[in-house]
């Protein structure tokens, strides 16, 4: 497996393959990174970073469009997630962070049952939030987990779990867990709204009485 050198962009967010992500670039070193990527038709990698530092597993990012350029050099742009990579070595020579990365090896496991469960839950979540399920989710059955994660707002830590899993089956199991939890939260929120509309009281069943 060959490694290649690319720019690294630590960020408090997680990009997954196929996801479109808007970025606002304001630091000089990352303005330089964007210029280099544009001039060299190169991609860079977004690595999730928090107080513990940047993770070694991330996702490559292709610049789709620079939507705005400001006079002071700041940029608004949109990137698309490419492939999951692992940083094997940090390198020097640029004003921004660079490293040698290699694609992460996938384990081949049958995930048909998990895919069906994840798709059904995704459709339920979309409908519960008043949205239309995106049919594109089923276009790449081998990466359905990423397609769903790109369309549902999950916490960064949970999206990082997806990047760190080595099989589509394992990722879909995470997706099923997250979507099921999300449906529970939506149901609780709906119940709270209903209670608020009735001053905290739940309507009695038919034929029942009421408090004096």
Predicted region positions:
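N-terminal low-complexity, acidic/polar interaction/targeting segments
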Residues: 1-212
